[in-house]
Amino acid sequence: MQCTRAVARLAGGLARTAWATQHTYKHRPAILGLLEQPCRLCSSTGVVDNTNKTKPGTAEAAEGGILKRVLNKVGFTPNTKARLKVTSHLLYESVADKINYVTFFRDFNLPNTFNSWFLVTELHVWLLLMRSMAEGSETGEDGRFLRNCIVEAMWGDVNTRAKKLGAHNPSRTRQQIETLSEQFQAALIAYDEGIMSDDRVLACALWRRFFEMNCDDYAQIERLVKYVRQQASMLDSLPRDQFIVKPKVAWLELDKCKV
């Protein structure tokens, strides 16, 4: 179970467009309202055989199939969609509740705004998505479903926070969230390419997205590259039980990651 292979699957599951791979994260005038507000909320995201042939054991198999479907609906099997949905929220909460955002703002000279909160959240959510795809990237598999649920949980939180900050202008808030969504999709592709390549490629991806091309301190970029590599290694080492069944993600502290 390697994150690098999972990343390739993740990248394959995304719609790669020419625009996305060349996206330079240009800020539009529309995002200057909500995204630059002080972040009061984050200072403390086959073929079916229809013949009627009767074969030995058919009735028993049918009964077993019905029982399995019933158990799946009520959540008594270990890998139900309902269980994975709960897991996705627990994993997202491990980011929103346990990451020290203030440390990121301070150490990387980020303004205390909603946009900075999203950039930090986005980076850690991407790490979770990469690890999720190691559990199966095909349609219907646990990893792909879990990935989608984590993204849903993140956008649910983003919408809640954005509405509180932009309650006076809901229409503009929606437009700004759409802009973030476009940037998020492009960031996933850039980060995937970076993690599968050497540190220079990853550093470029982080400089363009996380630092928004506004960082001349190479030590800061090198430190963030090291931090991302260490977090990816930590997640890759987690067995399925500690990631999906009973999520126990112990994020490494930024303060302990020095160049």
UniProtKB/Swiss-Prot annotation:
Compartmental location: Mitochondrion inner membrane
GO biological process: mitochondrial respiratory chain complex III assembly
InterPro entries, per database record: Ubiq_cyt_c_chap, Ubiqinol_cyt_c_chaperone_CPB3
Bridged cysteine pairs (disulfide): none
Keyword Membrane part of the UniProt annotation: yes
Gene Ontology CC terms: mitochondrial inner membrane; mitochondrion
Assigned keywords, A-Z: Membrane, Mitochondrion, Mitochondrion inner membrane
Keyword Mitochondrion: yes
Record's subunit section: Interacts with sloth1; the interaction is probably involved in the assembly and stability of the mitochondrial ubiquinol-cytochrome c reductase complex.
Family the entry assigns: Belongs to the CBP3 family.
Role description: Required for the assembly of the ubiquinol-cytochrome c reductase complex (mitochondrial respiratory chain complex III or cytochrome b-c1 complex). May be involved in cytochrome b translation and/or stability.
Protein name: Ubiquinol-cytochrome c reductase complex assembly factor 1
The organism of origin for this protein: Drosophila melanogaster
Organism taxonomic ancestry: Eukaryota, Metazoa, Ecdysozoa, Arthropoda, Hexapoda
